[in-house]
C-alpha cells in the first residue's frame, strides 16, 4: 500500500506526497507551492522521484519550476497534454495505464473534463488523486467544461470500487456539507458524517482521504437520483426536473450562489 502524506499549502490546498514500500523517494501531486515540498523533502531526507499534475491552475502547478531547478530538469512531470503546462515533460493525451518512472507504479489515467478542459485523475492501487474534480461532499466549479462533461466525469469516478480512497486537492469539506444539508437535510449518512468532519477539523485534522462509498452516500453531486434532492431542486428553481444532466447543472448553479 502507498504511504501518502498531506502537505497543507495556501489557505486550503493539499499537496499529496506518496511513496511505495519499495521506493526510497517520493512523488508529489499538484505542487502549487514548491517551498512547502522542498521543506518536507529536506526534513525527511527523501529524494523527489517525480510529479503528477491534474490540471493547469496555478495553485496546482506553481511549484514545478522551483522543484525542477532543485531536483533536476529531467525529473518526470506528468500532466494533461492539452493544457500545455510549463514544466510538464511527460504529457498525457489519453485514458489508460502508464508506469511512473523511477518508482515503477502502474497508474490509471482518467480524463475528467469539467473543472478545466483537460483535467485528469490518477488512480494508483486504491488511491485516487482527483485534483479539483471530486471533493468530499462536492465537486469543482465549471471554469472551462460543460455541465454534461462534469456529470459524465463524476459518473465515471462513481463507478470505481467503493473502497477507492479519494485524495482531493482542497479542504472544502465543511462548506460542502453545509450546502449538502440544505439540499438533502434528511440523509442520515450525511448527518453522521457532518458530525465526524466537524470533529476532525476542530482538531485541525484533514477530512481526507474520503472514499467512493462515502461520497456516494453523502455527496449530492453523486446522488442526483435522490428523490429528496430532486424535490429540493424543483422547489429551489420552480421548474420540473427532467434528467440527470439538468439536475447536475441546477445543483452546480445553486452551489455557486450558495
From Swiss-Prot:
Keywords: Hydrolase, Metal-binding, Zinc
One example GO MF annotation: hydroxyacylglutathione hydrolase activity
Pathway: Secondary metabolite metabolism; methylglyoxal degradation; (R)-lactate from methylglyoxal: step 2/2
Catalytic activity, EC: 3.1.2.6
Cofactor needs: Zn(2+)
Cofactor stoichiometry and binding remark: Binds 2 Zn(2+) ions per subunit.
Xref: Pfam families: HAGH_C, Lactamase_B
One GO-annotated biological process of the protein: methylglyoxal catabolic process to D-lactate via S-lactoyl-glutathione
Entry function: Thiolesterase that catalyzes the hydrolysis of S-D-lactoyl-glutathione to form glutathione and D-lactic acid.
Subunit structure: Monomer.
HAMAP family: Glyoxalase_2
Protein name in the entry: Hydroxyacylglutathione hydrolase
Name of the coding gene: gloB
Amino acid at each position: 500500500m502507498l504511504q501518502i502524506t498531506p502537505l497543507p499549502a495556501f489557505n486550503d490546498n493539499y499537496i499529496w506526497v506518496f511513496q511505495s514500500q519499495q521506493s526510497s523517494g517520493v512523488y508529489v501531486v499538484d505542487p502549487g507551492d514548491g517551498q512547502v515540498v522542498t521543506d518536507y523533502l529536506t526534513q525527511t531526507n527523501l529524494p523527489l522521484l517525480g510529479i503528477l499534475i491534474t490540471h493547469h491552475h496555478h495553485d496546482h502547478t506553481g511549484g514545478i519550476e522551483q522543484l525542477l531547478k532543485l531536483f533536476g530538469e529531467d525529473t518526470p512531470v506528468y500532466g494533461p497534454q492539452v493544457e500545455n503546462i510549463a514544466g510538464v515533460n511527460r504529457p498525457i493525451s489519453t485514458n489508460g495505464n502508464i508506469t511512473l518512472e523511477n518508482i515503477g507504479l502502474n497508474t490509471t489515467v482518467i480524463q475528467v473534463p469539467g473543472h478545466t478542459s483537460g483535467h485528469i485523475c490518477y488512480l494508483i492501487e486504491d488511491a485516487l488523486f482527483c485534483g479539483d474534480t471530486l471533493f468530499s461532499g462536492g465537486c469543482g466549479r465549471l471554469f472551462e467544461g460543460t455541465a454534461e462533461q462534469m456529470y459524465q466525469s463524476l459518473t465515471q469516478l462513481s463507478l470505481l470500487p467503493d473502497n477507492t480512497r479519494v485524495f482531493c486537492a482542497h479542504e472544502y469539506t465543511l462548506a460542502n456539507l453545509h450546502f449538502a444539508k440544505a439540499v438533502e437535510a434528511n440523509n442520515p449518512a450525511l448527518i453522521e458524517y457532518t458530525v465526524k468532519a466537524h470533529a476532525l477539523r476542530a482538531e485541525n485534522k484533514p477530512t481526507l482521504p474520503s472514499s467512493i462509498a462515502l461520497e456516494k452516500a453523502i455527496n449530492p453531486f453523486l446522488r442526483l437520483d435522490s428523490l429528496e434532492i430532486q424535490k429540493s431542486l424543483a422547489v429551489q428553481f420552480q421548474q420540473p426536473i427532467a434528467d440527470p444532466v439538468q439536475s447536475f447543472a441546477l445543483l452546480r448553479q445553486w452551489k455557486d450562489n450558495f
